[in-house]
């Protein structure tokens, strides 16, 4: 190989290595962000389910009161 090709190859390897190291340094933060987003969404889903359960209990209690008020035929 000529020296010109070796220098070009060397610079190409340096550029690729720099880009890869930047990409690999982003991976832990990306994974952490995905995990925290999933946990946050899961907490929101659980809190929404709790609210739905409370609303269901309120509706059942109101329905029982309404049925108690109806006359028996």
Curated annotation (Swiss-Prot):
The lineage of its organism: Eukaryota, Metazoa, Ecdysozoa, Arthropoda, Chelicerata. GO terms for biological process: defense response to bacterium; defense response to fungus; killing of cells of another organism. It comes from Tityus stigmurus (Brazilian scorpion). Antimicrobial peptide with activity against Gram-positive bacterial strains (S.aureus (MIC=2-140 uM), methicillin-resistant S.aureus (MRSA) (MIC=8-17 uM), S.epidermidis (MIC=1.17 uM), and the yeasts C.albicans, C.krusei, and C.glabrata (MIC=34-69 uM)). Acts by disrupting the cell membrane (observed on outer layer of the S.aureus). Is not active against Gram-negative bacteria (E.coli, E.Cloacae, P.aeruginosa), and the Gram-positive bacterium E.faecalis. Also shows toxicity against several cell lines, but possess low hemolytic activity at the highest concentration tested. Changing residue 25 to K: In StigA16; gain of antibacterial activity towards Gram-negative bacteria, and towards the Gram-positive E.faecalis, increase in activity towards fungal strains, and increase in antiparasitic activity. Its main location: secreted. One of its GO terms (cellular component) is extracellular region. Residues 1-22 form the signal peptide. Changing residue 36 to K: StigA25; gain of antibacterial activity towards Gram-negative bacteria, and towards the Gram-positive E.faecalis, increase in activity towards fungal strains, and increase in antiparasitic activity. Stable to pH variation. The modification Lysine amide is found at residue 39. Residues 45-73 form a propeptide. Keywords: Amidation, Antibiotic, Antimicrobial, Fungicide, Secreted, Signal. It is found in: Secreted. This is Stigmurin. Transmembrane segments: none annotated. Belongs to the non-disulfide-bridged peptide (NDBP) superfamily. Short antimicrobial peptide (group 4) family.
């Amino acid at each position: 190989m000529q020296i010109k090709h070796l220098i070009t190859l060397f610079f190409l390897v340096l550029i690729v290595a720099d880009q890869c190291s930047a990409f690999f340094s982003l991976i832990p933060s990306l994974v952490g962000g995905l995990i925290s987003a999933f946990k946050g969404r899961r907490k929101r889903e659980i809190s929404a389910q709790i609210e739905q359960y409370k609303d269901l209990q309120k509706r059942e209690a109101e329905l029982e009161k309404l049925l108690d008020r109806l006359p028996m035929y």
